[in-house]
Amino acid sequence: MYNIKQSTDTKEAAAIEARRNREKERQNRFFNVRNRVMGVDVQALNNQVGDRKRREAAERSKEAAYGTSQVQYDVVVQMLEKEEADRTRQLAKKVQEFREQKQQLKNGREFSLWDPGQVWKGLPTYLSYSNTYPGPASLQYFSGEDLDRDTRLRMQQGQFRYNLERQQQEQQQAKVDENYTDALSNQLRLAMDAQATHLARLEESCRAAMMCAMANANKAQAAVQAGRQRCERQREQKANLAEIQHQSTSDLLTENPQVAQHPMAPYRVLPYCWKGMTPEQQAAIRKEQEVQRSKKQAHRQAEKTLDTEWKSQTMSSAQAVLELEEQERELCAVFQRGLGSFNQQLANEQKAQQDYLNSVIYTNQPTAQYHQQFNTSSR
């Protein structure tokens, strides 16, 4: 087969691409709920979103600056604490080394002066005597004798002067070191105060800038709100003027009752234009009320007559009931008298029968011996 390259029409391709773009835009409009809902001000919503993002960015920058300043403060404090700890440790180390190297007891100049065994360690005064076995008369050193007392006193006084001068020098050096330490502490405190002042000034400037930006944003929002309220007032004033014009030129304020009649249905009434009833309507209503009043009066009269009849019938019924009750009481009295006489007769007869039984039939009463003859065995 031959490979034949077909040429495409550029206009047709452009038209197809344009149709595709229009279809995409239409689908975007249809499927985007926020743009499809009627009554949404997209520009205002976008402005609000932009304001909120700027406000959040300003807050984040403020928090970041505050966090950075806090980190700097912490780093400075840690550095100062570390330097102070290193300085204290080095000073203690140097003091300990000096004591170990320079202030040993055996190396002290006064050790030989205050040594309690120095007298016994010294050599005797006379060493020329070469007798190997001297007697008691040749003793050269006795207990409690101090031959070098003057020399030792002079050396002790010299040592006292040396110690006093050295103590004075050490005190002066300690004062110099203390003054130097105080000067360094003051310089460090001044540097920290300057750093804190600088950071406070930076924070104040950031706060002032943020407040200025917030004030500008509030002013802009207030201006927008004022413009919106002004437009609303103007629109309301126009509506009020139009309403006043309509009320003054329409049939609402007229006294013609015909304006309340519906143009399409004469039997209907327009409530907002109704001015009251006509004299004919009022006369018809009064006539109807009079008819209703007469009917009501006749009905009341009939009810009154019926009530009178019911009362008379009730009274006659009550009289008949009273008579029947009287007759019933009389009959009950006669019945009670007859019943009483009958009961008396029965009582007399029963008494006579009981007397007959007791006097004639039950004359032989059983004794205890008679009852003991029964149930004498188990069979």
From Swiss-Prot:
Residues 82-111, 216-304 form a coiled coil. It comes from the Eukaryota. Residues 1-21 are annotated as: Disordered. Its main location: cytoplasm. One of its GO terms (biological process) is flagellated sperm motility. One of its GO terms (cellular component) is sperm flagellum. It is found in: Cytoplasm, Cytoskeleton, Flagellum axoneme. Pfam families: RIB43A. Residues 8-21 have a biased composition (Basic and acidic residues). Keywords: Cell projection, Cilium, Coiled coil, Cytoplasm, Cytoskeleton, Flagellum. Microtubule inner protein component of sperm flagellar doublet microtubules. Belongs to the RIB43A family. This is RIB43A-like with coiled-coils protein 1. The gene is RIBC1.
